[in-house]
């Protein structure tokens, strides 16, 4: 019988990837992409679960992570292949949503073109993470077409809203989906062309900071209180908090990053007129959450750092900023390095790439957090995209790397399914931070 990896077809991967890129599934508008994948699943003799989880219901869930983009629901599709014998359940999952492409003038091609040049497929979401999603689809396809002579279950889930706090993964978990091991093919390809196996990631949360000022005529600027000037005082506190947090890093996989836990000011809005002193300012800020730190603890740390910094400021001590969490964001997460999932994937990757698989931790948050924290599913990240390409103009991905990752994940899934359920579940205790 042919090896399952022989069912990984480069032409089909290219076609599926181009088709997905051409669907402009900006977060909040993922229905067409999820529907496309649901239709793709229908060609296989698979169980399909396709539903919309209403936002009102999600908001009542105590695990609700918040959301920034307006939406009425979260569309999710799950496909399941059941083997001929009982055994473990392996989940391959990824998000369909992409960030807005920004100014089209910064792109060489239309952002959702899916143009192929040599080995690179171009388009918004190519690396983050439609290539990874297509690699997972190729795994599902390989098992569907090679027969059911395997134990256990293979579960494929396409979710929305990863770019908006992981709301889609919570919807999948609320739908009753669970597994003994989970792989998320987010972008982990290194500069050397070898994907890293990510077993831990930092968390992140979004905050809104409103800074009060006092208006005055620009010619009498000293009679006013510039909200921009006062924001710069707050900015100093933010940078000091970031410095202290990163100086305290002890996790060996996190210490290799120049800035494991980053704080970033993403937007600033303020003022009404060039000839008036700015009387208010609103900033949206992304704050890193350390491994072992809960989101609530991170928020308190950030808030206390600012309030301590401004306590002697004549204006801000009497007119403090309002700091409000926009969304809970992603908690940090970790799967222990001795978990059988890590060994299975590392061995499979070494067979495919002919080199040692680097084990790593990521400085960003993703859907791994939801599966680890809310479903207690051991989860790792391993995919063909490059994080340097993510959220950037002229995003692209290597077709060759996508095919290699797909074959790696086929081999990994085979190894996991051949394990005894108890072997995986005995290791199901994972490290998670809220």
Language-model features: where?
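Acidic/His- and Gly-rich active-site-bordering loop/insert found
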Residues: 2-121, 145, 150, 376, ...
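Short beta-strand segments
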Residues: 93-94, 157-158, 183-186, 210-212, ...
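Glycine/serine-rich anion-binding loops at beta->alpha junctions
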Residues: 119-134, 217
């Amino acid at each position: 019988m042919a090896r399952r990896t022989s069912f990984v077809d480069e032409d089909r991967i290219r076609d599926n990837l181009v088709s997905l890129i051409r669907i402009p599934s900006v977060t909040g508008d993922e229905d067409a992409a999820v529907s496309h994948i649901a239709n793709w699943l229908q060609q296989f003799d698979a169980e399909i679960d396709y539903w919309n989880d209403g936002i009102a219901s999600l908001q009542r869930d105590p695990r609700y992570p918040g959301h920034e983009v307006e939406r009425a629901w979260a569309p999710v599709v799950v496909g399941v292949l059941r083997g001929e014998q009982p055994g473990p359940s392996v989940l391959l999952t990824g998000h369909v949503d992409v960030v807005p492409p920004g100014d089209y003038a910064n792109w060489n091609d239309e952002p959702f073109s899916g143009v192929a040049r040599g080995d690179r497929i171009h388009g918004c979401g190519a690396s983050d993470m439609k290539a990874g999603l297509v690699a997972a689809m190729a795994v599902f396809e390989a098992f569907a077409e090679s027969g059911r002579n395997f134990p256990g279950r293979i579960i494929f889930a396409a979710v929305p809203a990863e770019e908006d706090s992981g709301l889609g993964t919570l919807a999948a978990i609320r739908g009753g989906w669970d597994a003994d091991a989970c792989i998320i093919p987010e972008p982990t390809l290194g500069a050397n062309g070898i994907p890293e196996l990510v077993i831990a990631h930092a968390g992140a949360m979004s905050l809104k900071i409103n800074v009060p000022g006092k208006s005055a005529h620009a010619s009498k600027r000293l009679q006013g209180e510039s909200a921009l000037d006062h924001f710069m005082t707050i900015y100093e506190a933010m940078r000091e908090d970031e410095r202290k947090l990163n100086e305290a890093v002890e996790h060996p996989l996190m210490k290799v990053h120049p800035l494991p836990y980053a704080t970033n000011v993403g937007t600033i809005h303020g003022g009404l007129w060039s000839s008036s002193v700015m009387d208010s300012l609103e900033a949206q800020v992304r704050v890193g959450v350390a491994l072992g730190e809960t989101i609530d603890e991170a928020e308190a740390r950030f808030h206390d750092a600012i309030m301590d910094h401004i306590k002697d400021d004549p204006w801000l001590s009497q007119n403090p900023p309002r700091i409000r969490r926009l969304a809970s964001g992603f908690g940090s997460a970790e799967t222990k390095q001795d978990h059988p999932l890590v060994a299975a994937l590392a061995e499979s990757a070494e067979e495919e790439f002919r080199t040692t698989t680097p084990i790593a931790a990521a400085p960003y948050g993703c859907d791994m957090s939801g599966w680890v924290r809310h479903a207690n599913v051991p989860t790792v990240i391993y995919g063909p995209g490059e994080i340097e390409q993510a959220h950037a103009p002229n995003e692209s991905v290597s077709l060759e790397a996508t095919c290699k990752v797909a074959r790696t994940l086929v081999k990994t899934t085979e190894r996991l399914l051949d394990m005894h359920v108890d072997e995986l579940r005995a290791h199901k205790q994972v490290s998670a931070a809220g």
